[in-house]
C-alpha cells in the first residue's frame, strides 16, 4: 500500500459489540453520509445505483485526498451521477466548536457530535505530525488518573464521527500549508474513549485511514491504544492489522486494580497474554508492542516497581513510554519528579528495554495525555461537567 500525507451507560466489563451491532445516534438527514462507508461499502452503495466500482473509488479520492464535501467539485464525475449523489448522499464531517493552540504548536479542537463534544489533538514534531482521535463520547473504564474517565460515558461514535475528525483536521491543516504546518503523518486512537468498546465503528474508520483511496497511511502509522478489553483485543487481530499500544500503568495487579479498574476483570497476566497473541498475528508492530506507563508520584514510580515492571514484561516484546502525569481539577495524584522518572527509566534500560520519557505536549491547553474531556452527558447520571470551562453545569438526562 502506498503511503500519502494527510493534507487537505456501559459497564466496565461490557462485552464487545456483536458483528451486526453498531451503536450510533440517528442521522440528521435521510441521506447516506458517505463518511460512514469504507471502500467495500461504498462500492456496494454505488452498485445499488447502477454504477461501476471505479466510480466509488473516484468519489473516495475526492473525499479523502482533497477533502472535498461538495459533489459538484468532483470534475471527473459526470453531471448525471453528481446530481444523483446530491439527491441521495452527502459528505458530512463533524464541525469544530472551538480551537485552541499551544505555544508548542499543538492544536486542540472541540468537535461537535450531536449535542455534545469530543476532542481531537494535532501534535507536530520535527519528523512527523500525529493526530490523536477520540472513539467515544466519554469513557466507561473509570481510570482514576484520566480526565476523560471522570466525565462518565455517553455513547460510541459513528464511523463518520471518527474518520470525520481526521477529515476535518486534514482540511484545516491543508489550509495552513503555506505557513509550513506539517501534514498529518500518523493517527493514534488515544483520544476520548476505549476504542475496543467501539470496535465495529473504529475498525472501518481505521480501514479508511489506511485505504489508498482514503488517507493512505501505512498500518505502522495507525495506532490503537487499549486499557485491556481482552475479548475485543482477540477479535481485533482477526479484523485488521494496526500498531498496538497498551495502557498498563502499573507493574502489579493490586495497584492496577485501583487505578485501572478493568484490571479486576482482565488482570495483567491475562492482558499481556492477549497482547502476545495479537503480536503473533500482526505485521504492523514490528514484533513488539508499545507500553504506556503514566508516572504517578509515589504510586507506581519507585525503583522497586521499575524492577517489578521489568519482570512483568520479560516475556512480552515491547518498548516502554514513560508518560508524565498531566493534572486536572480534583485529581488526587501528583506528577512524579524528574529524578524519580530518571531512576525508573534507568532500571528499565538496564534490563534492556527501549525506554522513552515522553515529552508533554499541549498541556497549556489541556491537550496532553489524560487531559481530554470534551462535553459529556453521562448516562449513569453523574454530574455533567464541561472541563474545558472548568465549571460544572446543569445535569441533562438522555
From Swiss-Prot:
Disulfide bonds join 132-369. The active site is at residues 119, 369. Gene3D superfamilies: 1.10.150.530, Aldolase class I. It catalyses: adenosine(2503) in 23S rRNA + 2 reduced [2Fe-2S]-[ferredoxin] + 2 S-adenosyl-L-methionine = 2-methyladenosine(2503) in 23S rRNA + 5'-deoxyadenosine + L-methionine + 2 oxidized [2Fe-2S]-[ferredoxin] + S-adenosyl-L-homocysteine; adenosine(37) in tRNA + 2 reduced [2Fe-2S]-[ferredoxin] + 2 S-adenosyl-L-methionine = 2-methyladenosine(37) in tRNA + 5'-deoxyadenosine + L-methionine + 2 oxidized [2Fe-2S]-[ferredoxin] + S-adenosyl-L-homocysteine. It is found in: Cytoplasm. GO terms for cellular component: cytoplasm. Reaction proceeds by a ping-pong mechanism involving intermediate methylation of a conserved cysteine residue. It comes from Yersinia pestis. [4Fe-4S] cluster binds at residues 139, 143, 146. GO terms for molecular function: 4 iron, 4 sulfur cluster binding; metal ion binding; rRNA (adenine(2503)-C2-)-methyltransferase activity; rRNA binding; tRNA (adenine(37)-C2)-methyltransferase activity; tRNA binding. S-adenosyl-L-methionine binds at residues 193-194, 225, 247-249, 326. InterPro entries: Aldolase_TIM, Methyltransferase_A, RlmN_N, RNA_MTrfase_RlmN, rRNA_lsu_MTrfase_RlmN/Cfr, rSAM. Its EC number is 2.1.1.192. Keywords: 4Fe-4S, Cytoplasm, Disulfide bond, Iron, Iron-sulfur, Metal-binding, Methyltransferase, rRNA processing, S-adenosyl-L-methionine, Transferase, tRNA processing. Belongs to the radical SAM superfamily. RlmN family. Residues 125-364 form the Radical SAM core domain. This is Dual-specificity RNA methyltransferase RlmN. Binds 1 [4Fe-4S] cluster. The cluster is coordinated with 3 cysteines and an exchangeable S-adenosyl-L-methionine. One of its GO terms (biological process) is tRNA methylation. Pfam families: Radical_SAM, RlmN_N. Its cofactor is [4Fe-4S] cluster. The keyword Transport does not apply. Transmembrane segments: none annotated. The gene is rlmN. Specifically methylates position 2 of adenine 2503 in 23S rRNA and position 2 of adenine 37 in tRNAs. m2A2503 modification seems to play a crucial role in the proofreading step occurring at the peptidyl transferase center and thus would serve to optimize ribosomal fidelity.
Amino acid at each position: 500500500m502506498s503511503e500519502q500525507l494527510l493534507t487537505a451507560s456501559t459497564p466496565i466489563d461490557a462485552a464487545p459489540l456483536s458483528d451486526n451491532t453498531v451503536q450510533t445516534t440517528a442521522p440528521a438527514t435521510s441521506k447516506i453520509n458517505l463518511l460512514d462507508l469504507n471502500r467495500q461499502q461504498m462500492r456496494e452503495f454505488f452498485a445499488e445505483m447502477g454504477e461501476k466500482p471505479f466510480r466509488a473509488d473516484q468519489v473516495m479520492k475526492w473525499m479523502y485526498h482533497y477533502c472535498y464535501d461538495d459533489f459538484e467539485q468532483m470534475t471527473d464525475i459526470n453531471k448525471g451521477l453528481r446530481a444523483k449523489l446530491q439527491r441521495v448522499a452527502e459528505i458530512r464531517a463533524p464541525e469544530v466548536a472551538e480551537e485552541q493552540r499551544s505555544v508548542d504548536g499543538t492544536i486542540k479542537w472541540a468537535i461537535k457530535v450531536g449535542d455534545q463534544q469530543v476532542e481531537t489533538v494535532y501534535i507536530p514534531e520535527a519528523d512527523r505530525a500525529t493526530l490523536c482521535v477520540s472513539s467515544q463520547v466519554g469513557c466507561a473504564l473509570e481510570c482514576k488518573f484520566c480526565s476523560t474517565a471522570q466525565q462518565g460515558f455517553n455513547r460510541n461514535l459513528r464511523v463518520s464521527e471518527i474518520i470525520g475528525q481526521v477529515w476535518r483536521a486534514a482540511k484545516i491543516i491543508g489550509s495552513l500549508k503555506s505557513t509550513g504546518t506539517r501534514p498529518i503523518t500518523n493517527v493514534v486512537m488515544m483520544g476520548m474513549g476505549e476504542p475496543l468498546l467501539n470496535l465495529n465503528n473504529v475498525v472501518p474508520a481505521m480501514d479508511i485511514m489506511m485505504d489508498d483511496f482514503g488517507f493512505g497511511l501505512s498500518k505502522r502509522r495507525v495506532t490503537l491504544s487499549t486499557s485491556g478489553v481482552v475479548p475485543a483485543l482477540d477479535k481485533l487481530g482477526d479484523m485488521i492489522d494496526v500498531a498496538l499500544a497498551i495502557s498498563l500503568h502499573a507493574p502489579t495487579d493490586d495497584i492496577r486494580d485501583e487505578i485501572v479498574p478493568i484490571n479486576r476483570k482482565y488482570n495483567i497476566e491475562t492482558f499481556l497474554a492477549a497482547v502476545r497473541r495479537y503480536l503473533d498475528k500482526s505485521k504492523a508492530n514490528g514484533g513488539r508492542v508499545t507500553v504506556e506507563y503514566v508516572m504517578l508520584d509515589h504510586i507506581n514510580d519507585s525503583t522497586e516497581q521499575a524492577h517489578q515492571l521489568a519482570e512483568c514484561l520479560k516475556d512480552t516484546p515491547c518498548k516502554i513510554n514513560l508518560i508524565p502525569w498531566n493534572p486536572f481539577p480534583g485529581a488526587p495524584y501528583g506528577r512524579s519528579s524528574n529524578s524519580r522518572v530518571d531512576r525508573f527509566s534507568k532500571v528499565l534500560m538496564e534490563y534492556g528495554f527501549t525506554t522513552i520519557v515522553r515529552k508533554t505536549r499541549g498541556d497549556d491547553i489541556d491537550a496532553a495525555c489524560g487531559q481530554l474531556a470534551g462535553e459529556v452527558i453521562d448516562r449513569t447520571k453523574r454530574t455533567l461537567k464541561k472541563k474545558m470551562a472548568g465549571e460544572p453545569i446543569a445535569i441533562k438526562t438522555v
